[in-house]
């Protein structure tokens, strides 16, 4: 795999994390820079690990991974999205935003990275250095997620609760689209 292909793959795998991070940054209103870096690190590490898991599983587990990844992604993203929507509509003004919970951050990172596991399975059939590819995916996702949080910060300063509701709907929609895509394929 050429260096250009590795970079293209890495940034392609980070798009979901970027979109979710923009929503999280907006929902938090004014996330600190340390929160953006922490979010980027969590998304980056999870996004780097999942293709390695898929690569290791290879052919033996490909049918299992493909059979359940869409259900796992839908369940995680739908739960987090509905929880954010609920919090945006019914939380008290001084309540802590849902997105600051590490559990929510981790569930969202896992939900957006399950497709990377399937990519990892396909990489098992190619002559690639999985460490290089996984590192590139992790770094790209770190940059995109951290940047997404900071972009979302600008939006959230003006639209806090609305942004949290939209982010919740977007997460649910992302999970639903993953589920529909796999069920109709």
Curated annotation (Swiss-Prot):
Membrane topology classification: Multi-pass membrane protein
Record GO terms (molecular function): manganese ion transmembrane transporter activity
Cellular component terms per the entry's GO annotation: plasma membrane
Keyword vocabulary terms for this entry: Cell inner membrane, Cell membrane, Ion transport, Manganese, Membrane, Transmembrane, Transmembrane helix, Transport
Signal peptide residue numbers: none
A Pfam family reported for this protein in Swiss-Prot or TrEMBL: Mntp
Residue stretches spanning the membrane: 3-23, 41-61, 70-90, 101-121, 123-143, 165-185
InterPro entries to which the protein is assigned, alphabetical: Mntp/YtaF (IPR003810), Put_MntP (IPR022929)
Keyword set includes Ion transport: yes
Chief location of this protein within or outside the cell: membrane
Localization per Swiss-Prot or TrEMBL: Cell inner membrane
Function: Probably functions as a manganese efflux pump.
Entry's family note: Belongs to the MntP (TC 9.B.29) family.
Name listed for the protein in its UniProt record: Putative manganese efflux pump MntP
Record organism: Bradyrhizobium sp. (strain BTAi1 / ATCC BAA-1182)
Gene responsible for this protein: mntP
